[in-house]
Amino acid sequence: MHLHFTPRQIVEKLDQYIIGQKDAKKAVAVALRNRYRRSKLAENLRDEIAPKNILMIGPTGVGKTEVARRMAKLVGAPFIKVEATKFTEVGYVGRDVESMVRDLVETSVRIVKEEMVVKVQDKAEEQANQRLVEILVPSPEKQSGFKNPLEMLFGGTQNSNQTTDSQEDVEIEKKRQDVERKLAAGLLEDEIVSIEVTEQQSSMFDMLQGTGMEQMGMNFQDALGSFMPKKTKKRKLSVKEARKVLTNEEAQRLIDMDEVTQEAVYRAEQLGIIFIDEIDKIAGKQSNSVDVSREGVQRDILPIVEGSNVATKYGSVKTDYILFVAAGAFHMSKPSDLIPELQGRFPIRVELTKLSTDDFVKILIEPDNALIKQYMALLATEGIEIEFSDEAIRKIAEIAYQVNQDTDNIGARRLHTIMEKLLEDLSFEASEITLEKITITPQYVEEKLATIAKNKDVSQFIL
């Protein structure tokens, strides 16, 4: 966990991936720092301080989800994104709002488990290598020293059998030491071995997903799992692949699942972040009799955000200190259309701005995972070096901005569509092109995109 970052450091880290939106970055940076500050307080005061939930307002594609996701990744906090429209009011078929907390705990368990596996990796690999040695040089089947009732009475051949067994054991030990040396030197990586692995059983309760009955299914499945033996199957793999499988199995045996569960529940409760997208879609008090009440969903979300106990397969989880980040475009509604109680639970309001042409230029070239860098890396695998002139990048940004203005504004996601269309022919012919270096010019961009971009009827289907 990395809760020690200062707000300024958090913003600087987010700047590496997200362009603009300073207000949103500052809000999440302060929220994260307050968690660190809270952890330093005396226990009686710490229990009184709950995180200040954030409401992000802005059109699609401006970075609402990415800000929250990168923030969680930065500190290693459990994070999930849910869509408010997927939930239904209690009493209707569909996902109940408590499932978001259960999903958060599952994410937390996965994170903690991965960390624990890393800690025992060396020991697990050592045990996996030992199993490989035993597979490559198996012990001979011991034959009974008694052939008939008379031998049983007088033990006629017992000593000779013991001598033979002792010689065989010495021979096997020598062979195993030799194999151990070869394994350590990497000389047997391509040898094929047959190993028994635990079979992943498909759950008969998968059909319950999305019906609001997942918890019942999971508990029933766990109860059955403790009685039913695990199935194993034989697989033929190279030593290299078998080592990975066996190391994973040994690591699972070495980690203490009770410790994993305890730490995971603690992290979910104290450090968890739940991002509720499209909250504007459940705002508004009008509801048709045919539709599931949107206000009812808000009222179901309210106790989770306020703080309550949610039953999960890992035990009861308190939601009092989970940070909730809600987001919505609020085109057809406004934050005040949410029920007053829910509004009060999101005291920090942040408005994200629409992206300009200059923002698009920065998005294309500045972030560590910039789109142009991605395409350059992809085509480099075919032996082609592509570069974009500054004028070409500006032209791409202008076209993306214009198409957003003329059709639906989908923010930075428009750049993905534009870039795919721009490099479509080049990507298709890359394996056959003999040129080692290609420069994308404004003329090339104009040729590939301008005609489509100017025709609104065509651009709304293609771009």
UniProtKB/Swiss-Prot annotation:
It comes from the Bacteria. It is found in: Cytoplasm. A double ring-shaped homohexamer of HslV is capped on each side by a ring-shaped HslU homohexamer. The assembly of the HslU/HslV complex is dependent on binding of ATP. Pfam families: AAA, AAA_2, ClpB_D2-small. ATPase subunit of a proteasome-like degradation complex; this subunit has chaperone activity. The binding of ATP and its subsequent hydrolysis by HslU are essential for unfolding of protein substrates subsequently hydrolyzed by HslV. HslU recognizes the N-terminal part of its protein substrates and unfolds these before they are guided to HslV for hydrolysis. CDD domains: RecA-like_HslU. PANTHER family: ATP-DEPENDENT CLP PROTEASE ATP-BINDING SUBUNIT CLPX-LIKE, MITOCHONDRIAL-RELATED (PTHR48102), ATP-DEPENDENT PROTEASE ATPASE SUBUNIT HSLU (PTHR48102:SF3). Signal peptide: none annotated. Keywords: ATP-binding, Chaperone, Cytoplasm, Nucleotide-binding, Stress response. This is ATP-dependent protease ATPase subunit HslU. InterPro entries: AAA+_ATPase (IPR003593), ATP-dep_Clp_protease_ClpX (IPR050052), ATPase_AAA_core (IPR003959), Clp_ATPase_C (IPR019489), HslU (IPR004491), P-loop_NTPase (IPR027417). One of its GO terms (molecular function) is ATP hydrolysis activity. One of its GO terms (cellular component) is HslUV protease complex. GO terms for biological process: protein unfolding; proteolysis involved in protein catabolic process. The gene is hslU. Its main location: cytoplasm. ATP binds at I19, G61, V62, G63, K64, T65, E66, D277, E341, R413. Belongs to the ClpX chaperone family. HslU subfamily.
